[in-house]
Amino acid sequence: MVFGRITELFTAASSRLPAGSQSSVPYMPTGSSPDVGTSVSDSISIGNGGRKNCLRHSASLQDFSSYHGFDPEESILPREAISWGQNGSSFSKEKGSVPNGTNPSTRRKLIRAVMIVMCLFLFAFLVYIVSMYIYTNWSRGASRYYVVFDCGSTGTRAYVYQASINYKKDSSLPIVMKSLTEGISRKSRGRAYDRMETEPGFDKLVNNRTGLKTAIKPLIQWAEKQIPKNAHRTTSLFVYATAGVRRLRPADSSWILGNVWSILAKSPFTCRREWVKIISGTEEAYFGWTALNYQTSMLGALPKKATFGALDLGGSSLQVTFENEERTHNETNLNLRIGSVNHHLSAYSLAGYGLNDAFDRSVVHLLKKLPNVNKSDLIEGKLEMKHPCLNSGYNGQYICSQCASSVQGGKKGKSGVSIKLVGAPNWGECSALAKNAVNSSEWSNAKHGVDCDLQPCALPDGYPRPHGQFYAVSGFFVVYRFFNLSAEASLDDVLEKGREFCDKAWQVARTSVSPQPFIEQYCFRAPYIVSLLREGLYITDKQIIIGSGSITWTLGVALLESGKALSSTLGLKSYETLSMKINPIALISILILSLLLLLCALSRVSNCLPRFFRKSYLPLFRHNSTSASSVLNIPSPFRFQRWSPMSTGVKTPLSPTVRGSPRRPFSFGSSIQLMESSLYSSSSCVMHSCSSDSLGDIQYDSTGSFWSSPRRSQMRLQSRRSQSREDLSSSLADSHMLKM
């Protein structure tokens, strides 16, 4: 039973050794000798000098492979038998170096350094993710504020928005926006919008710094009251100018933007120079579409829903934006990605199609039809002209901004040509004039006319035709509200209301509505918006939904800017990797598990675990063993005992020595016991214990193998630290000389 257990232990140990590094020394009982006639391969061969032995260096007689055969006739001991430096072995207590390849300790240090760096990097990344996740949860109530100025052709409007993180799972949009202008009550002037506004527009204030201050300061003061004082310095202020400033000369627009920036630099909000700029018509359309679909809960919806197109009618231009399944590649194409949802948009701006510019074009069209225009009257501003879209009894001065390019020699002031308009209402002529203002070929430099009955006459060549459901906002909403029409009213209802208004005398019409700007132009605006939708864009009544006054493109600016800021400072509720969302809890768990595995690998390489976590080491002999018998008092060399780190006061010998022998270091009755009792295993991880009766009985043959004779007297040799390599070599040579 004991030998069976021993066999199992040796089998398990040998199975873990590489095939090329297993010891070639078979076990041979003490005192036995090889049979007569046994071949060299059957004897106790210790291997050639060039082959690494399985015995660990610096323990007892480390490497028997360094012995060479001794020729008694020549009586010369080979030099390699005395000096083992060439094979990296030595009788000294220093370890030999590896003859070939990289030093294992160097390779282990390199692996250890790489693993330490990986552990530090993984730990730092884990700390970052955990801190961001904790900060995000602690910052649920944190909000950022945004102030956006809409610098249009008719005036400057201020909007304030509050942005916070969206934790709802039914949307991929991470931002929740709240407009702080919703609670503002409209003034008695009959404004259609709930907003803070100053007049006139920036385009009317060129070279008028005092006018700019007057237009800006009330907006800043109002915004300060909407935002908590402790959040003023973190509030971002954006000033975006649209078509009114776009049509100015570059020098004039640069002067306006520069002076606006110098005024806003003293405000309590954060405003950068690049945030004061002119945006293109396409950008304005893009912002408007984003704001519309956010408010209708279509933006970032999961699963994806059909979005609405946006028709944003301003004072100078019309912005058209819709989602187009046909991926065209031109200046109107835009791609928007919200979370995992992609939107392919067609967006363009139609300059000159705003409500104010359209009426201006109607005046230009009538001016061209006047015969024999007196230039002196234009210069002096005495020209009088009848307009079919003005109420009877109306008589007033009108500044025509486009008339100067049509009539040479006219008096052009800072804002255009002054013309006196007289009301001459005619509904048929008014409708035809509105349709003429829609047809781009009538007032542009197009060589060929466009028939509005055959194609959309407001679209330039190459622009995609609008399709789908549309929200008509801004100017469309203003006209509907002026006539007290609900959003469900049809375009025919607009025409009916417009005709009724045109039939009224000016004094009656003016008092029938709340005081507001441009009352006289609504007789023209009613047929104009209908003709613009039906003939200009080919959009039917069923495709139109009239939006509220709260839908403005400024919301899109705040939404997109807050998305950039919040994603970089607060962290979002999920992380997208390879188009797959990972919950922060799962990501943190994966990182912790990876760190633990890496630490286990590092401990395996560097043996850096505490001693009580390590597997117990089982050497063949105790440190204080002084006999060749078993530590269990059983006369067998195969019994093992668990190693104990407790010192018994007896040092473990590391070099062979003679105990209880005559003064000569070696005699015929002596024996050598080779023991390895180091704390660490040998290079092949196998513990060896080899003994022989006497060095004097060692027989060498021509092949370099040896065996011991059992006829010699038994005398034990025990290793000691004081025996040097030279003494042992001399003893070996002396013992062989005696045999001769």
Curated annotation (Swiss-Prot):
Glycan-modified residues: 137, 208, 330, 374, 439, 484
GO BP, sorted A to Z: anther dehiscence; pollen exine formation
One Pfam family recorded for the sequence: GDA1_CD39
InterPro entries, alphabetized: GDA1_CD39_NTPase
Sorted UniProt keywords: ATP-binding, Calcium, Glycoprotein, Hydrolase, Membrane, Nucleotide-binding, Transmembrane, Transmembrane helix
Cytoplasmic compartment spans: 1-113, 603-740
Record-listed E.C. numbers: 3.6.1.5
Upregulating conditions: By wounding and drought stress.
Reactions that this protein is recorded to catalyse: a ribonucleoside 5'-triphosphate + 2 H2O = a ribonucleoside 5'-phosphate + 2 phosphate + 2 H(+)
Region annotation Disordered: where it falls in the sequence: 706-740
Subcellular location: Membrane
S-S pairs: none
Topological domains, Extracellular: 135-581
Chain segments annotated as transmembrane: 114-134, 582-602
Listed CDD domains: ASKHA_NBD_AtAPY7-like
Binding site for ATP: 147-157, 309-319
Active site per UniProt: 284 (proton acceptor)
Main location: membrane
Disruption phenotype: No visible phenotype. Apy6 and dapy7 double mutant exhibits late anther dehiscence and low male fertility. Pollen grains of double mutant are largely deformed in shape and in most cases, the cell walls of the pollen grains are interconnected.
Names of required cofactors: Ca(2+)
Single GO molecular function: apyrase activity
Gene Ontology CC annotations of this record: membrane
Family the UniProt entry places it in: Belongs to the GDA1/CD39 NTPase family.
Its biological purpose: Catalyzes the hydrolysis of phosphoanhydride bonds of nucleoside tri- and di-phosphates. Involved in the regulation of pollen and anther development.
Designated name of the protein: Probable apyrase 7
Protein species of origin: Arabidopsis thaliana
